[in-house]
Amino acid sequence: MITRFAPSPTGYMHIGNARTALICWLYARSRSGKLLLRIDDTDLERSENRYVEGIKNDLTWLAMDWDICFNQRSRISRYDEVFNSLMDAGAVYPCYETPEELELKRKMMLKMGLPPIYDRSALNMTEQDQKAYSGRKPYFRLKIGRDQAISWEDEIRGKVVFQAKNISDPILRRTDGSYTYMFPSTVDDIDFEVTHIVRGEDHVSNTAVQIYIMGLLGAKIPSFAHLPLLRMGGSKMSKRVGGTEIFKMRDMNLEPMAINSYMARIGTSLPVEPHTNMRSLVDSFDIKLFNQAPIKFELEDISKLNVRLLQKLPFAEVQDRLEACGIKCSEGFWYAVRDNINVISEVKGWAEICGPGVTPVVDDVNRQLLQLASDLLPEGEPNDGTWKTWLQKIKECSGCETRDILLPLRLALTGVPKGPEFAKLLPLIGRVEILRRLRGA
């Protein structure tokens, strides 16, 4: 089993691209197959090396590896070879219209209530037409047999049928000699023996053309699966819609596995749950679980999943990362604060709160209560049982209810209104610092 992820390096990878990559990766790894990373850089004007590096960096950060990587630019001579064979077979023909002329034709056909399909006028040029186009460089179209039906059994959409008469002869090569997406893609899929192709539903019509080309070349047709596109604010995801790039999510300190857990489950019948490693996603993967329903993307959903993931991570999985951020903490500290952070970088704030230098927050109404609390603090360093004993003493001596004690005490000890359980927090702050904060208040 061989599948491929084929990004165009014309922009940074967004969540929609990454989802396709992940599903391709999971499909390959769940079947002990191979994943090809093909860089579709035939768009000479817009493709940039910085985007190639960005794509690779993002995939690596998301824990997705690949078995083979190649750029389409390195295979131009191969595309020329196959293109010339199609020319010799009469399957490709030159055309001379400008983009403006083609757009005018399209509008006229729509005005007449006809589908905007190329009229094949280039196949019936008169001598006068040829003189009119003299000096123009041709572009080339594939001649599709109009009496055929192109079909395949899509792994997500089921039976898909295209009547060739409703398909415009696709452009394979531009006037500058560069190739459009579908031709090099088809040649690569054949040459690298790709068996399974997973991509967005916006490629469904391309699939019909590629199957036709594969038939002309006598190639075996791979299996296809077309995923519904992610939508944000009613529009499909694209590189032109900002805020969804993977590098921005990395800068937000979101966990790679939170993103992967989200991408692997949206659009399926399975609940979106945080997974701490890729193995569990591989083991539960099934392409048949995906459906055709539209998918609305919300970054907030990943943020919420990120919180749930952090609450599951053991200390051993975060220790090195914390130390790399300059945070040296104990296992007990991590388990005390992990339920109170949105992203892992917030651990630093709790490390500072548990250290010296916190300024107590207190009003005059609670000053007497805090002084009493300091007098009642049990002797010795706080342990897991200190909080229960201390709270009971404060309640008995002050006559206050628990709810009237918690907030003043938390503000005095941490400077913030919410945080870890006191039973876990007190041993981290230590007796001397607790007394300093209460009496300093």
UniProtKB/Swiss-Prot annotation:
Give the residue range of the signal peptide.
Answer: none
Q: Name the residue ranges of motif: 'KMSKS' region.
A: 236-240
A biological process (GO) of this protein is: glutamyl-tRNA aminoacylation
Q: What is its main location?
A: cytoplasm
Q: Which UniProt keywords apply?
A: Aminoacyl-tRNA synthetase, ATP-binding, Cytoplasm, Ligase, Nucleotide-binding, Protein biosynthesis
The record's section on HAMAP family has:
Glu_tRNA_synth_type1
What protein name is recorded for this chain? Glutamate--tRNA ligase 1
